[in-house]
UniProtKB/Swiss-Prot annotation:
One of its GO terms (molecular function) is nucleoside transmembrane transporter activity. The keyword Transmembrane applies. It comes from Arabidopsis thaliana. This is Equilibrative nucleotide transporter 7. GO terms for biological process: nucleoside transport. Signal peptide: none annotated.
Amino acid sequence: MTNPEDIPSRIEGKNVARLVCCFLGVGSLVAWNAMLTITDYYYQLFPKYHPSRVLTIVYQLVANVFIITLATKEAKLNTRLRNIFGYSLYTAGTFCLIILDLASHGSGSVVAYVLLCLIVALFGLADAFVQGAMVGDLSFMSPDFIQAFMAGLGIAGALTSVLRLITKAIFDNSPDGLRKGALLFIGIATLIELACVFLYTLVFAKLPIVKYYRAKAGKEGAKTVSADLAAAGLQEQAEQVHQMDESKIQKLTKKQLLRENIDLGINLSLIYVVTLSIFPGFLYENTGEHRLGDWYAPVLVAMYNGWDAISRFIPSIKPLAMESRKWITVCVVARLLLVPAFYFTAKYADQGWMLFLTSFLGLSNGYLTVCIFSTAPKGYNGPEANALGNLMCVFLLGGIFAGVCLGWLWLIGNDSF
């Protein structure tokens, strides 16, 4: 076992680590958000196939199957390889989107749609690898890191929305403008994913404060950090962690962790059941025609993403962070009222009220998500925090998948179905 004096004492680089965590958060969602944000292009190509709903189900089905599998084996997995593989898969997937569009000349054929679904399935696989690995890894570090990573998830949505509005404005009146904007958009996402591969592989593990937390977690019995310790030049500590006798490691089982945190897990699922039952399918297909015309849906998506991103920074201000589990539960349950609110707003109100509701949907989604992920790992050692982070991701993706499936209910009685 690693001696206390072997643990790096230098913990400089906290701000750099937060910045890298934020960028890695952007990279873990920018590929999928790019798909969601250019959905208007895919509706032009495949108007009869409900692309926003179908692609989301494909993505979430694959992500859920693999995140459950990976979460059950998290203690024995190489976190470093898991993250590198996930970000590399994101990079390959976004590049394949460009190749597919160029090869099919932007046609809306069934073959192109099937291939598009397969690429989206790759994104789901990448999500399962990256989300659990990154959240689990950051859960035994400073709470600021998990907040920065979660903020990055929100920034990914806001960034893609802003870029989408810019490209739509630039190419709106040009021939084949929607397609040109979408290709430029996916190209930018590919570069971001590639940057994440290099950042995680070459930079993150070597930051002094990251070395400190990983060496500390290794001392507590977290074997998942072994490869990252070796990559950071801490060969001796990595070898000691690798050879550690698991029977001597004191930690709670996954069932015990689940019992102690089932309230947070259910709350996290409910947050995303509500969000994904509305966003993005309802916003694209059930909000009617308004003065903004074909700008209406992209603007709604941008409002959601913008407020979701802003709200994820609020818990970093300590007095504004919600740590009470009871109050988190109250807020999550109250948020269920957004479903009938959106229904009646779409049916009877004007676009101003819809913009307000969409903004609140994003604001509450981001804020409550960060509060839960920041609260859950407190008081646990390295292996327990890593396991709990993976379990929370299972609840998150489960809620997203349930929300996506429930989103189809909006089509009942809809003449366009």
